[in-house]
């Protein structure tokens, strides 16, 4: 009575460590969630990156694995402030349009934001963008792995790389214009993110600068 009542379980795909939930993991979490009469939500801010990483269909990663509601993200894959809510259980829709309005998610001329999603999925642009970002993440991760004093914190499964750097390398990167936050200086993992428009030479230039700090 005096506590917030649970109504759903939410997972982030790709998750906060840059790792990807496998299909069987999503299914197991969903099964437990539904067993307790809760709804299963997926935060898909990097949905396309996860999809490319798993090489599966959108259906396999969502409703076939027990997802009830998906936040379909596009902002982190080439769009501007464009997201969509997808319900796989119609009875959950309810008054979501009113809630969106109340929460300030209906902008004036919203159609110009929404129109991006049409272009986003046409000719698999969203998957091509995600594949590029993931490939660059892998390229960066492999390059960092060549440094004995740099440790990868987690496996690189999409477009986020977490690694700890020695102070001399952080100082050198800062001097070259790559700003590393102070709270990441002393042995804490630095998050490096590659994007849909990251070029090979962007990654190679970063790695070359690191070599000069040895």
Per-region residue spans from a language model:
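Conserved PLP-enzyme active-site core in the AAT-like
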Residues: 1-176, 184-198, 206-213
């Amino acid at each position: 009575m005096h506590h917030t009542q649970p109504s759903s379980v939410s997972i982030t795909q790709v998750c906060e460590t840059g790792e990807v939930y496998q299909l069987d993991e999503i299914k197991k979490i969903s099964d437990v969630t539904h067993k307790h009469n809760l709804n299963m939500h997926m935060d898909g801010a990097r949905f396309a990156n996860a999809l490319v990483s798993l090489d599966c269909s959108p259906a396999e990663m969502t409703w076939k694995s027990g997802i009830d509601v998906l936040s379909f993200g596009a902002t982190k894959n080439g769009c501007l402030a464009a997201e969509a809510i997808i319900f796989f259980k119609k009875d959950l829709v309810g008054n979501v349009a009113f809630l969106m309005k109340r929460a300030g998610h209906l902008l004036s001329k919203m159609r110009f934001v929404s129109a991006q999603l049409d272009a986003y999925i046409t000719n698999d642009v969203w998957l091509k963008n995600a594949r590029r970002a993931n490939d660059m993440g892998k390229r960066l991760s492999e390059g960092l792995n060549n440094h004995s004093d740099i440790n990868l914190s987690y496996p690189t499964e999409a477009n986020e790389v977490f690694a700890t750097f020695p102070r001399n390398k952080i100082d050198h990167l800062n001097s070259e214009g790559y700003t590393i936050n102070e709270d990441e200086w002393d042995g804490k993992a630095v998050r490096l993110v590659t994007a849909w428009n990251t070029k090979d030479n962007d990654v190679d230039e970063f790695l070359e600068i690191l070599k000069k700090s040895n």
